Amino acid sequence: MKNPNIIQPEDLRISQIIDANLDRAREGLRVLEDWARFGLGNEDFVIRIKNFRQILGKNHLEIYKLSRNHIEDQCKGLSHVEQINRNSSSKIISSNSARVQEALRVIEEFSRIHNSKLSKIASEIRYEIYTLEIEILNFNTRKRAQSIISKNNLYSITDPRENLLEIIEKILLGGVKIIQHRFKEGNDKDHLKEAIEINKLCKKYNSLFIVNNRLDIALASKADGVHLGQDDLDIKTVRKLLGASKIIGVSANNSTDINKAVKDGCDYIGVGPVFPTLTKKNKEPLGEEKIKALTKELNIPCFAIGGINKLNISSLKNHGISKVAIVSGLLNSEDPKDEAMIIIKELSHEN
């Protein structure tokens, strides 16, 4: 039975336009759906995108499909240089989201007179995609950062010194992929200026830049995330202010604080101190056995911290600890690049 609300367009070209753009929208949605499924493992995104695809498929009527004439389409196969430059998952997400949004806008306009139902559907889905694109991009960015943290065993933490940028670049050249900026002296202007410069270096070497404690500096310097102590703002508050795309690390030294941090949604945990250290003078070292006991059941990355250097890496490895955060053990080295390379190799070595 024919739907009385759907009128066959008198101009065949209108049906062709709608058909082509329904194809575009559905194809773009399929790209987004497959990345949400295989790249991000996000069931919520998959369900939402699949629903949009099914709705458009149901409304891809025969009157539109029968108008298709690829043989006489003089513009088929045209491409643009920007299509070649989609060299990251974020660019693929953005370009295919735009493809869907633009196609839906065309459908909305050209179906308004003869198929008001389709026009309304296109409008509603288009606005949903505007929001979904940002959600996917944020999740994708955070997923990348989480992957770097998961795959890399050495985490470098800074302390104030005159030639810090030079040292950090050497550490990055040594293969370190995570840098945390800890700034306990000076004023906020100097702190921010230094943070911005370190972030530039990290981006140059495709590494993560984390700011210790200071949410405001993390936001202003466009850091990849922030690392919190037990006396800092809580994770849920920081997440609201920081946004969904950034990562949050937490320092903890007991099971209660560790379990709470995991429950509240942190991305990784720093546990320590393992050994005596000048950066945590007032804290009793936990020792290797305690660190292992605290972290063995966790399903997020955990970095042991405190008094760690290349001389005790082997002992940590013997206790099943393979992810470490190091401060002076790298910064005070005569050759930070070689030191980083040696430690990374030692951490990756199977016992």
From Swiss-Prot:
Pathway: Cofactor biosynthesis; thiamine diphosphate biosynthesis; thiamine phosphate from 4-amino-2-methyl-5-diphosphomethylpyrimidine and 4-methyl-5-(2-phosphoethyl)-thiazole: step 1/1
Binding site for Mg(2+): 213, 232
Region ranges (Unknown): 1-128
Domain of life: Bacteria
Function: Condenses 4-methyl-5-(beta-hydroxyethyl)thiazole monophosphate (THZ-P) and 2-methyl-4-amino-5-hydroxymethyl pyrimidine pyrophosphate (HMP-PP) to form thiamine monophosphate (TMP).
Listed Gene3D superfamilies: Aldolase class I
Protein name: Thiamine-phosphate synthase
Originating organism: Prochlorococcus marinus subsp. pastoris (strain CCMP1986 / NIES-2087 / MED4)
Annotated gene: thiE
UniProt keyword annotations, A-Z: Magnesium, Metal-binding, Thiamine biosynthesis, Transferase
